[in-house]
Amino acid sequence: MNSGPLEFTVSANTNPATDAVRESILANPGFGKYYTDHMVSIDYTVDEGWHNAQVIPYGPIQLDPSAIVLHYGQEIFEGLKAYRWADGSIVSFRPEANAARLQSSARRLAIPELPEEVFIESLRQLIAVDEKWVPPAGGEESLYLRPFVIATEPGLGVRPSNEYRYLLIASPAGAYFKGGIKPVSVWLSHEYVRASPGGTGAAKFGGNYAASLLAQAQAAEMGCDQVVWLDAIERRYVEEMGGMNLFFVFGSGGSARLVTPELSGSLLPGITRDSLLQLATDAGFAVEERKIDVDEWQKKAGAGEITEVFACGTAAVITPVSHVKHHDGEFTIADGQPGEITMALRDTLTGIQRGTFADTHGWMARLN
């Protein structure tokens, strides 16, 4: 088995996007609509370990129709962003945390772990050839990076694959909120659950997202933007919003307290969540990780004790929650507008990511 450092080979795309096409895309990229000229591919076999590290032209991949990923969903993924700073450097936010979470997901899905140094080097290799796809500094645009691992061995037996492929693709991403931060309305899902104790909820695994689609469609039917998941046992404790972690602000000003659902094994351990817990502490706020049930949310929002609610994740960073619907009624958080603490934390985190705030925790890693 290969135990030494991987050497990447580079095969340049002979038909890349023209400067004009790329600039047109970067002017209005949306999310997940366009892709850069190249991608990274690394193979795994039991005998050779991780090997055959390549940067190749972006394009379709070949899979045997009986590949295990297509039948039993053995796959994992991550999501992170690359930002261009004013000094020309291209950076990413806590990529080592994404590498660690990919390893954690791999353990849960019986997939061999990709070493952190290989993960980080794959980001650098892709940026080296597709640097022009990173949007200019000064705005909220970024280059979204999607690393993932799929089980490629042919076979219909239900077992872990002996062959895998790590892939890294990149897609320019526009500002999540255009024309100002917009709060979202949410539907509390009592009928469906995202994950249960002992399940795959703490892994970033496609099956979790596929299983969420019906509940998300139900939320849309109820006139809501997103679904909020409750625990699988009692259907009363708040877990996540869509694929994002939730925070509740009790009180206001310097005496405010931030509460987020504790990591129970059925929640994704969000990197943005972890970072906001640190930034809130830095700002002097009390923070607490504990269970919070729906009744407490509604009663304390009605009494004015819960003053702000927001969700957090890589794509939107922070999304304010304004209105909640459920089977027995609905309620609004405060005046339904983004809260002061919500916006202050968002400004701090995005400022660190954009290089306009001091990175006192050493979270930003240069990729070029």
Swiss-Prot record:
The record lists pyridoxal 5'-phosphate as bound by: R101, Y209, I271, T272, T314
State the organism named in the record. Mycolicibacterium smegmatis (strain ATCC 700084 / mc(2)155) (Mycobacterium smegmatis)
Where does the record place the modification N6-(pyridoxal phosphate)lysine? K204
What this protein is called in its record is Branched-chain-amino-acid aminotransferase
Q: Which UniProt keywords apply?
A: Amino-acid biosynthesis, Aminotransferase, Branched-chain amino acid biosynthesis, Isopeptide bond, Pyridoxal phosphate, Transferase, Ubl conjugation
Q: Which reaction does it catalyse?
A: L-isoleucine + 2-oxoglutarate = (S)-3-methyl-2-oxopentanoate + L-glutamate; L-valine + 2-oxoglutarate = 3-methyl-2-oxobutanoate + L-glutamate; L-leucine + 2-oxoglutarate = 4-methyl-2-oxopentanoate + L-glutamate
- Biological or metabolic pathway of the protein: Amino-acid biosynthesis; L-isoleucine biosynthesis; L-isoleucine from 2-oxobutanoate: step 4/4; Amino-acid biosynthesis; L-leucine biosynthesis; L-leucine from 3-methyl-2-oxobutanoate: step 4/4; Amino-acid biosynthesis; L-valine biosynthesis; L-valine from pyruvate: step 4/4
List the CDD domains: BCAT_beta_family
* GO molecular function term, any single one: L-valine-2-oxoglutarate transaminase activity
Source gene?
A: ilvE
